[in-house]
């Protein structure tokens, strides 16, 4: 019997610096505490605990591209893990980290990583649009499972189950072609709703890449792709 437990508490300050229909610019600073543990035999044995305290700073931009008829949103975030702050692990992982370094439970709580996202919904014609998704992560540190980039599942490479691969570094990109129901019929479906309001068909292609270092110098890489 194996049980996993994850807890995350988060506080942040969101500030909007520019607010208009065409363009919005905001920043967000935050502090979070995170905990992950895996137990065996109804709690009789623990494989270790990852405890993190993470400070973040984000820049977020979104708007309407009136010239090319598109909606977009992008962000870039710096994450800093802090050693021995608010219960986080020290430089040796309290000798009990869930994530192992070369097989030893010594993952430290300190780390740095950079993440970014960009999404764009592009109108092509009345009934056709394209959806571009991008997410990326970079770190020179070995990360806890709480901080790795996850590939697989409904929000990344959809042909694979959630968490098929997790990496300290990674990227995900997807292109979708969306056809709304108005292409098939301009009539009312029911009430005040037309087919373009209630029906859409999407064809998509996903790609993900991830990379890990295990603390002993070994490197693991994985590529995932799918379409539907």
Predicted regions and their residues:
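C-terminal transmembrane beta-barrel domains of outer membrane proteins
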Residues: 96-228
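Transmembrane beta-strand segments of outer-membrane beta-barrel domains in Gram-negative
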Residues: 1-145, 211
């Amino acid at each position: 019997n194996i049980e996993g437990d994850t807890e995350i508490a988060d506080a942040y300050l969101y500030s909007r610096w520019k607010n208009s229909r065409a363009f919005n610019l905001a920043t967000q600073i935050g502090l979070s505490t995170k905990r992950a543990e895996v137990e065996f035999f109804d709690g009789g044995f623990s494989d270790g605990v990852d405890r993190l305290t993470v400070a973040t700073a984000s820049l977020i931009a979104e708007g309407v591209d009136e010239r090319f008829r598109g909606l977009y949103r992008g962000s870039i975030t710096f994450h800093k893990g802090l050693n021995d702050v608010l219960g986080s692990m020290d430089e040796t992982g309290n000798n009990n980290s869930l994530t192992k370094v070369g097989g030893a439970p010594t993952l430290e709580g300190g780390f740095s990583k950079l993440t970014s996202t960009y999404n764009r919904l592009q109108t092509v014609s009345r009934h056709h649009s394209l959806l571009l998704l991008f997410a990326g992560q970079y770190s020179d540190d070995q990360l806890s499972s709480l901080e790795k980039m996850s590939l697989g599942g409904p929000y990344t490479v959809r042909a694979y189950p959630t968490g098929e691969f997790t990496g300290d570094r990674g990227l995900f990109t997807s292109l979708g072609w969306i056809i709304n129901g108005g292409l098939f019929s301009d009539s009312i479906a029911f009430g005040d709703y037309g087919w373009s309001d209630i029906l859409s068909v999407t064809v998509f292609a996903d790609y993900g890449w991830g990379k890990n270092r295990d603390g002993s110098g070994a490197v693991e890489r994985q590529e995932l792709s799918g379409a539907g």
